[in-house]
Amino acid sequence: MKNQKLAQALIAAAFALAAAPLAIAQTQGVSKTEIVIGTEQDLSGPIVAFSKQLKNGMEMRVEEINAAGGIHGRKLKLIIEDHGYDPKKAVLATQKLVQKDKIFAMVGLIGTPTAMAAMPILFAKNIPNLFPITAAREMYEPLHRLKYSVTATYYEQVRASVKHMVRLKGFKKVCTLYQDDDFGLEVMRGAEAGLKEINMALAEKTTYKRGATDFSSQVAKMKDTGCDLVVLGTIIRETIGTIGTARKLGWNVEFMGTSASYTDLIHKLGGPAMNGFYSTNTVNNPYMDDASKNVREWALKYKDKYKEDPAVFSVYGYQVIDLFIRIADKAGPNLTTDTFINAIEKFSMPRDMFGGDELSFSKTKHLGSNRARLSQIVNGKWTPVTDYITE
């Protein structure tokens, strides 16, 4: 009987030992020597300039961690696919990354419609969608164990900042010009909500179709209304076009945008007319002469590598990979989707050297931070004018 029990115990132990490496092998994208992650960028479409910077920042951080020995001895491999900012292409790119490349996680995918197209494919294979480059609420709502975001929503950026601007400068008539799509509606609704909290309402609402280049009628309408602050739901070309049109008409109204228009391209392409423009932002643009020594050194390293100055999207790319590295490290040497999720739901970190806000996640909080700050273009450079706005 004793021999029989001993035999059974030995068999059970053998199965347990055999199952341990099997559990690791069954975690897609994780081997003894490597962690494979994927991203999808627009390398051939309308926001290729942003994605080029993102790609550079991501690859820079990957090279750094690999040179330092990796994560618990595993090198990090980043596979980049081009979706051209097209949801149909995003579906194909996601299928390749999941089925052929066997990624462990999707990190830093750019675009709301493309992320929405990718998530069902990822989630069906138990693959997380981490830190997409979009401020849409759908990136963390409704709550799902496999989706996590870090970017303050357009709605919340505008809700808080429009109240702050009114209180700071005493504006009496707030108007808005926004893109006629989901992005623009989020901006408009945020402005409405913020003004309602201080017993105000939008004095004028104007829209434009995506791809528009003439904003003269919208600007004239808002000027006739007597607006003294215009909230812009615009990106690059539309921001420059609207402000430029207003200045040509001799209308020196104040303009405020969102993180979608917080880019060095505004002042580089728009010139002196862009001075005075306000925008919300969640991280500071890294100028080569930044006040921070750490940022200056980072920017110099970036420029040496890529032969161009870094920009805010370079920082976004660097940050999302850095965040993945930190959480994967906390997950420990036995990296699985479950251990990663357990680590992220207990994760928090202070502000980083780029001015990014404190981040924290939990089982019920899958957005790292929902705060933004205001910056203004002064003498051709973005300059912070507030800390992170809480109300």
Locate each region found by the language model.
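Short glycine/serine- and small hydrophobic-enriched flexible loop segments
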Residues: 42, 63, 322-330
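Extracellular/periplasmic periplasmic-binding protein-like sensory domains
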Residues: 243-317, 384, 388-390
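Extracytoplasmic ligand/sensor domains, especially the bilobed periplasmic-binding protein
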Residues: 88, 102-205, 254-279
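Segments of small-molecule ligand-sensing domains
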Residues: 304-314, 325-382
